[in-house]
Regions:
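N-terminal pro-sequences and low-complexity stem/linker regions of secreted or lumenal proteins
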Residues: 1-517
Length: 517
């Protein structure tokens, strides 16, 4: 690697593909391509069969036309053959299906045609209940259609220094060589939309913009969602879990940050192979008519309500501390969960700075610092506004994790409050520990955005004292958004949001649809 281009028929890549590992270990497999098999229908694969780009599948590069890699990986096997294999109990243990351009839903192809193609696959599977009862159908998309994604994807920083680009857990550092590319060696790939904006040089790869993935099986029925971080290597990791055949080309950073899809299924429960009968909708009167854009347009709205959600392997917290003597503000990342997690941090005082990126492996911690903006001589000016923070850092993580730290350096003789978060994984509740290491008391208010009807908790925090503030999250299914403010310190804010995992099923975020949360 790296694999930038499509190398069909010649000069193919040479590293080992996963079908080769299946073949070596006696696991049956086949790639279906060539269209539906109906006379006159398209037979291309829109170059979406990446096996064609490897020399071991290319007859022109010396591969035998009768080899299993060629006959099963780059030869036409249509949906008609797929249907026959299912009906006759010949479906391989692992199958890949590649659609022609007309059915791939790439612009200008129609989503309606893509839905038809998917339906042909599903109808073939459910027509044989024995096969369907032991099948997982994974529907992948490889692009996001050019839509804007507000979530910064997980990506390792280029450097490993405090107060710089971010940090990665030490046990993941050895894997990072696979996550960087020297773009100066590939000048043709430097084609930014904005001329001159590509910095070149060594750059991280990361996960890229989010794309949909649907898991259809007897173990995933019911409209469930799973918000663990996944990427395209997660599909291979799922096959690893199923067949115990490891793919060594997946590095440890990817394995830490990206799950293996097993969290999305209920393999411990009773599978439900039943097929729901959905009535055919009425034909729209506007079918085949030009689309009319309304004069007054509006943003699309989130679907109301919640969905059942799978339990996730996360237990993530962040906490802060101030070092007035050194002029540093520290944030401690703690991951006590069973999976790694990626975070990014934004500096509200310097919004032009790119976000810092962090990767914290399971059962590990990281700490990073920011220079306090008011640690210099300007702190001595009496005219300095009361609402003038010295730090303003926001942290984003997986599954709605968010924390916000804002405030000013406490002056001598003033209160110095700090807040830490603790999860009760047995009950799904959360507890805040409020500590005041300053020499004066302060009035503290804690508000939960998921409990708008409540006035919040009003607390008096004495000097050199500690308080515990408990929140029952049963009404919000373990979701919380707690803001801590101090009456006489308007710049002070500690905000913690996310979900408390219990190992049991829950719901999707009930605050996503609300305009207030």
């Amino acid at each position: 690697g790296p694999g930038f281009g499509e190398r069909a028929k010649t000069n193919g890549y040479t590293w080992t593909t996963y079908p080769e590992r299946l073949e070596k270990n006696g696991v049956s497999w086949k790639l279906y391509q060539g269209g539906s098999g109906e006379p006159g229908s398209p037979t291309d694969n829109y170059t979406d069969n990446s096996l064609e780009f490897f020399s071991q599948y290319q007859v022109g590069e010396g591969a035998s036309p009768n080899s299993p890699l060629v006959t099963k990986g780059v030869t036409d096997h249509t949906l008609a053959e797929f249907r026959e294999d299912v009906a006759n109990n010949r479906l391989p243990e692992v199958s890949w299906i590649v659609a022609p351009y007309q059915y791939c839903e790439h612009p200008e192809a129609s989503p309606r045609d893509g839905a038809w193609y998917i339906n042909q696959i599903l109808e073939s599977l459910v027509a044989n209940p024995e096969v369907w009862s032991k099948t997982v159908f994974i529907l992948n998309y490889d692009e996001n259609d050019g839509l804007f994604d507000h979530v910064v994807p997980p990506m390792p920083p280029l450097t490993q220094q405090t107060n710089a680009q971010g940090l990665v857990s030490p046990d993941l550092l050895a894997a990072l060589d696979d996550e960087f590319i020297d773009m100066d060696q590939y000048p043709y790939e430097r084609r930014p939309l904005v001329p001159g904006s590509d910095p070149g040089g060594k750059q991280p790869i990361g996960l890229g913009a989010r794309v949909p993935l649907l898991l259809i099986s007897p173990w995933s029925t019911g409209g469930w969602v799973c918000s663990q971080t996944f990427d395209h290597t997660s599909v291979l990791q799922f096959l690893e879990a199923r067949f115990d055949i490891r793919e060594p080309n997946i590095n440890q950073w990817r394995r830490s940050i990206c799950g293996d899809l097993t969290a999305a299924f209920d393999f411990a429960g009773t599978p439900n192979p039943a097929i729901e009968k959905i009535p055919v909708p009425a034909v729209l009167a506007s079918l085949h008519q030009p689309y009319s854009v309304p004069d007054v347009q509006s943003m699309p709205q989130q679907e109301p309500g919640t969905r059942p959600a799978r339990a996730l392997p996360y237990s993530l917290t962040t906490s802060s501390r101030i070092e007035p003597a050194t002029g540093r503000f520290w944030i401690d990342f703690e991951n006590s969960g069973k999976a790694g997690a990626a975070f990014y941090a934004r500096n509200g005082i310097l919004p032009q700075e790119p976000p810092r990126r962090y990767s914290v492996s399971a059962a590990n911690t990281l700490s990073d610092c920011w220079l306090l903006s008011g640690s210099g001589p300007d702190r001595k000016h009496a005219s300095r506004p009361r609402f003038d923070p010295d730090y303003d850092i926001s942290i984003h993580g997986p599954n709605g994790f968010f924390s916000h730290f804002r405030g000013a350096i406490p002056a001598p003789g003033q209160p110095h409050p700090e807040v830490t978060v603790h999860y009760n994984h047995a009950t799904g509740d959360v507890q805040l520990t409020l500590a005041n290491t300053g020499n004066a008391p302060c009035a503290v208010k804690v508000v939960n955005a998921y409990a708008k009807s409540e006035v919040g908790h009003q607390l008096q925090l004495e000097a050199h004292a500690t308080l515990e503030d408990h929140w029952n999250l049963g009404a919000s299914s373990g979701w919380f958004d707690l803001s801590v403010t101090v009456t006489d310190a308007p710049a002070f804010l500690r905000r913690f949001a996310g979900h408390v995992e219990t190992g049991r099923a829950s719901t999707s975020d009930p605050g996503v649809f609300s305009e207030e949360v």
